[in-house]
């Protein structure tokens, strides 16, 4: 009943969205201005991203507990699982680059928001008989999770291209460092 009342993934999509907007503003500001308070604020936002990831994980665990099977039995569950894998890889890879975590947070927000479109049913359903095999379940989970790093690498590639476009003689040194981080 609490799960249905709070709708954790709809709330998380909003929180990831707000956090990604803040990260975009302050990480881009951090590239051009080296201020201590901006660095501290970015670190706080990174911690908030970790907290949201923990809540995302708890939401997946609660879906697993309620349904009695792994949460990738329909399109809605697959999308929220892909969003989880995007954030997992974003946090893992983004330890050294706040731009990577910013891109992961933005992409996670978009992915979770797309899971709540009208054509997807968030109902907790029974596992499809074809997925009843343990080996097939592991195979599907790995294949579906692999979309996370694929989407993240696409966004990071686009971000690198934008940084290259906006590189001038004045900011070449800083931009080269950020491009190498990505």
Q: For each of these PLM feature ranges, what is it?
A:
Residues 1-182:
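Polytopic transmembrane helical bundles with strong interfacial aromatic enrichment
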